[in-house]
Amino acid sequence: MSNAPILLTPGPLTTSIRTRQAMLVDWGSWDRDFNQLTASVCEQLLAIIDGSASHHCVPLQGSGTFAVEAAIGTLVPRDGKVLVLINGAYGQRLAKICKVLGRPYSTFETAEDQPTTAADVDRLLAADPAVTHVALIHCETSTGILNPLPEIAQVIKRHGKRLIIDAMSSFGALPIDAREIPFEALIAASGKCLEGVPGMGFVFAEKTALAAAEGNAHSLAMDLHDQHAYMAKTGQWRFTPPTHVVAALHEALQQYNEEGGLPARHQRYADNCKTLLDGMAAIGLRSFLPAEIQAPIIVTFHAPNDARYQFKDFYERVKAKGFILYPGKLTQVETFRVGCIGVVGADGMQAAVNAVAQVLREMEVLDI
């Protein structure tokens, strides 16, 4: 594994040797030891948001999107209505989930470099009293933009509506306190800022809302009410759990706490982001977002203007030097993305910048 490239992506991402080694043990899915492992993971996850008094942690097999779909399908009644706030591809995915599930919804879309504002939400909720829930992406992974969650959450509370947060790319690195930010559900996953491996999502569901959600779900496997009720009764998952993923996440959480928890994880990622932005600027590559709305999770860069630049060739050359980047996901301009998260520090980020600079010279890309 020493020759494996560093994944500068928003997940899956580079994990530690300890996390990978945790997957070398096989677990019985009904065994008491594994049940205790699951309970410990959920307890530690709740502690990150100070949510044990107000929310249940409900784990679910699959990618983060599975958990997002489960949260909407379980917590939004079939006669509810979701206002989906969009400024990127993952907000659009939220709207598509509502459409496929048959949940009434409306959308409010801003430009990919424009956060939704609390004033926008205030106006939209005043104009449409039928809305029961608001769904938003905290950190929109398609650009790295950070939406103003605390301000928006207070507006939603004032209107008596309920908030569903996709915190896939922010949970564990950006502060979210359940005692200060009112939300019905917050969704995240194992393979992002916690530096576990992909394969498990989890939903922090407000206790009274989850208790009232029986019968809402469109799906047996994605019924969070049933999943929680079964776990509370037996300590077990309803269906075969991703045992190795859970074990890896448990180990990743131990390292998270050893590092210093959220403040330390946030600081490392912020240092990574600054090193990346400063280094790329020095070679002429422009970031898509202004610094004040850039989350230290993933950075979008404008592609060079030079005709000799082709992303596929650029990607393969950078990969050969030990770094895997991410293609752009914008509709209007050509970009590429570089993640700041995973088991990597500022020295690794500087090495990645050096590799990018060397590749651009090799490609004779001059018009940056």
From Swiss-Prot:
It comes from the Bacteria. It catalyses: (2-aminoethyl)phosphonate + pyruvate = phosphonoacetaldehyde + L-alanine. GO terms for biological process: organic phosphonate catabolic process. Keywords: Aminotransferase, Pyridoxal phosphate, Pyruvate, Transferase. It is an enzyme of class 2 (transferase). Its EC number is 2.6.1.37. Its cofactor is pyridoxal 5'-phosphate. The modification N6-(pyridoxal phosphate)lysine is found at K192. InterPro entries: Aminotrans_V_dom, NH2EtPonate_pyrv_transaminase, PyrdxlP-dep_Trfase, PyrdxlP-dep_Trfase_major, PyrdxlP-dep_Trfase_small, SP_NH2Trfase/AEP_transaminase. GO terms for molecular function: 2-aminoethylphosphonate-pyruvate transaminase activity. Belongs to the class-V pyridoxal-phosphate-dependent aminotransferase family. PhnW subfamily. Homodimer. Involved in phosphonate degradation. This is 2-aminoethylphosphonate--pyruvate transaminase. It comes from Pseudomonas putida (strain GB-1).
